[in-house]
Design a protein with these regions (language model features):
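Conserved PLP-enzyme active-site core in the AAT-like
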Residues: 1-176
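Structural motif of enzymes handling amino- and sulfur-group chemistry
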Residues: 165-213
Length: 213
């Protein structure tokens, strides 16, 4: 998100985090150097949409939201929340902690989500005992895809999935994205244990891809 904002010369410093979001969200935003501000919940435990809209402004980089939230409730105003944040120039990050409740039923991208991490141990059967092995793939919207860390995977129009590293990133971007990537560097390791990706894929294939595409 910061890389995308900097690319357009926009220095925003606030991340909004609803009270109903996963407890790690404010810590994550603060660790990334953002100022964190709370958005209150309604009496029924969902994001107060009007309070969110009232706080949006030129200093807000985005919102970190968990859907379903930590109260176990689906954020019914999710699309309206995303539309409001986008209209104000910000981005929407969704915590995938409770994704297993909606996977196959609704697509985060259709709700306006720009970035989301997926907890494979919570949603796609990989082990979590003993502290891991952890694996948290991150998916990005078209707006944020050119600004993600390397390496990452991208599917071209011919259906081929590519693993993008630094040495081929610029050539790939010119051919498929119409311009240079503006990634913020390479991660020291990949997004967790590759073996967990394989196990999650086997789990998905065994159940079928209906509702996942």
């Amino acid at each position: 998100i910061r890389a995308a904002l900097e690319a357009r010369g926009d220095a925003r410093e606030v991340i909004l985090v609803p009270e109903s979001a996963h407890g790690t969200n404010p810590a994550t935003a603060a660790f990334a150097g953002y100022k964190v501000e709370d958005i209150p919940a309604t009496a029924e435990g969902r994001v107060d949409l009007e309070a969110l809209k009232a706080r949006l402004g030129p200093d807000v980089a985005g919102v970190m939201i968990t859907n379903p939230n930590t109260c176990g409730l689906f954020e019914r105003d999710m699309k309206a929340i995303s539309d409001a944040v986008h209209a104000a120039g910000g981005f929407v990050y969704c915590d995938g902690a409770n994704f297993n409740a909606i996977v196959g039923k609704v697509r985060p991208g259709d709700l306006g989500v720009d970035a989301m991490h997926i907890n494979l141990h919570k949603t796609f059967s990989t082990p979590h005992g003993g502290g891991g092995p952890g694996s948290g793939p991150v998916v990005l919207s078209e707006a944020l895809a050119p600004f993600g860390p390397l390496p990452y995977t991208a599917r071209t129009k011919d259906g081929v999935v590519h693993l993008i590293e630094e040495e081929d990133a610029e050539e790939f971007a010119k051919e498929h994205f119409g311009g240079a990537l503006q990634h913020f560097g390479r991660m020291t390791a990949f997004h967790g244990q590759m073996g967990m990706f394989t196990r999650a894929l086997a789990y998905i294939l065994s159940h079928g891809a209906d509702g996942l595409k």
